């Protein structure tokens, strides 16, 4: 009998201690570390965060952006297949540029890696054609990875080839295309691929895209170089490279293009 009483007594003490320990743990505020620290020990002051002045109008370039096209000239662009030649597209009303069908694509003079891009585009003034034949163009990141530009307003095509798709790789989450004669925007956050010293792929490129302010690509991996026929891949290592706009035989229009290297 005495041994049972002693056992029950010891058990009750152990149980009480366990409950007390749990209560003490629960009562510790989650925002206070149990380590003996002061608040300033986790404050980082240097280097001070750089100041960038945002644009007064949404979509305009912030103070640290590189202006690639402001409507007045094509000085930052060259012919895609011969960078010794000037960009062959035309400027309209000192406001926007227009593809000259058959003249070939254009590329930036500067090369980029990780970057933020803003670009505005409009389908041709005359709505004609269907599927891939309506207002087709493309923004090529590092001259390899295509963000599709297409008039996808009431225009059915394959889902991974419509506006805001990573062409034949990722369909957009939604179709956010505006109607005829309206301007569209792409805001892009691009992370370039990484390669090992021996040239092998270490990390694929990634991209986030907002189409007219709507999220359509959410930090997706780019499978590789864009091909019309065949599977995307990374055939060779590369560094920074140009941005290119495609001539697909349609009078697609562009304005207000800027980039922020990241």
Residue ranges and their predicted role:
Residues 1-7:
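Bacterial N-terminal signal peptides that target proteins for export
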Residues 22-262:
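Carbohydrate-interacting regions of secretory-pathway proteins
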Residues 8-16:
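Bacterial N-terminal signal peptides
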Residues 17-21:
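Sec/Tat signal peptide C-region and signal peptidase I cleavage site
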């Amino acid at each position: 009998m005495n041994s049972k009483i002693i056992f029950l007594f010891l058990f009750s003490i152990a149980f009480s201690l366990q409950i007390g320990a749990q209560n003490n743990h629960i009562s510790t505020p989650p925002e206070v570390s149990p380590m003996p620290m002061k608040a300033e020990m986790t404050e980082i002051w240097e280097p001070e965060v750089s100041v960038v002045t945002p644009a007064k109008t949404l979509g305009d370039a912030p103070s640290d952006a590189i202006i690639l096209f402001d409507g007045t000239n094509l000085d930052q662009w060259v012919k895609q297949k011969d960078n010794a030649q000037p960009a062959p597209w035309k400027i309209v009303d000192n406001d926007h540029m227009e593809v000259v069908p058959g003249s070939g694509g254009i590329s930036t003079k500067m090369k980029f890696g990780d970057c933020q891009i803003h670009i505005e585009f409009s389908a041709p003034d005359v709505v004609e054609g269907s599927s891939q034949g309506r207002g087709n163009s493309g923004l090529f990141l590092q001259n390899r990875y295509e963000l599709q530009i297409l008039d996808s307003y009431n225009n059915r095509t394959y889902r991974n080839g419509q506006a805001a798709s990573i062409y034949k790789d990722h369909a957009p989450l939604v179709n956010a295309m505006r109607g005829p004669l309206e301007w569209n925007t792409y805001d892009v956050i691009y992370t370039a691929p990484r390669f090992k010293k021996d040239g092998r792929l270490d990390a694929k490129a990634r991209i986030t895209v907002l189409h007219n302010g709507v999220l359509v690509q959410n930090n997706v991996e780019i499978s590789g170089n864009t091909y019309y026929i065949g599977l995307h891949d990374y055939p060779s290592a590369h560094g920074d490279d140009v941005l290119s706009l495609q001539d697909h035989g349609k009078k697609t229009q562009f304005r207000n293009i800027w980039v922020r290297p990241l």
